[in-house]
């Protein structure tokens, strides 16, 4: 009620120390120390051009091996990056090597163009643009 004065709680230092200790341990459990930082891939990056006459911007920097490996890996084709197809479209043509070694001497499958004297003559006429009809 409004008319009654509140009872004053006697502060117990041991009890206060225990409460502070629990708060401190709770904060330590929820805190996380971030030591690795990276660029957010969902955020647009604004490029700032360097000053052309600045001496510290024109120093040669050593190549970062990890970055170069990432770039070279990204430039490879999917068959060199992955052991198997990653999508349905990649499955078509994933194994593009011939299953059977082609036998070039087998005339049942290989029909090579053979030239004789008359076919060479006619091919030369056609390449020069001459018409084979009589006038």
From Swiss-Prot:
The cellular component terms of Gene Ontology attached to this UniProt record, alphabetical and capped at eight, are: ciliary base; cytoplasm; cytoskeleton
Which residues does the annotated region (Disordered) include? 77-97
Keyword Cytoplasm applies: yes
Concerning its family, UniProt says:
Belongs to the CFAP144 family.
Q: Any keyword Cytoplasm?
A: yes
Coding gene? CFAP144P1
Protein's name according to its UniProt entry: Protein CFAP144P1
Q: Look up and give the organism this protein is from.
A: Homo sapiens
Q: Per the record, a Pfam family?
A: FAM183
Subcellular location per UniProt equals:
Cytoplasm, Cytoskeleton, Cilium basal body
Record keywords: Cell projection, Cytoplasm, Cytoskeleton
């Amino acid at each position: 009620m409004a008319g009654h004065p509140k009872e004053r709680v006697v502060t117990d230092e041991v009890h206060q120390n225990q409460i502070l200790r629990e708060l401190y341990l709770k904060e330590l459990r929820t805190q996380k120390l971030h030591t690795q930082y990276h660029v957010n891939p969902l955020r647009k990056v604004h490029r700032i051009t360097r000053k052309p006459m600045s001496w510290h911007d024109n120093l040669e920097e050593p190549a970062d091996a990890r970055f170069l490996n990432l770039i070279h890996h990204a430039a490879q084709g999917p068959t060199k990056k992955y052991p198997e197809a990653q999508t349905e479209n990649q499955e078509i043509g994933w194994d593009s090597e011939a299953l059977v070694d082609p036998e070039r001497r087998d005339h049942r499958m290989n029909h090579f163009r053979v030239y004789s004297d008359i076919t060479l003559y006619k091919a030369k006429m056609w390449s020069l643009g001459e018409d084979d009809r009589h006038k």
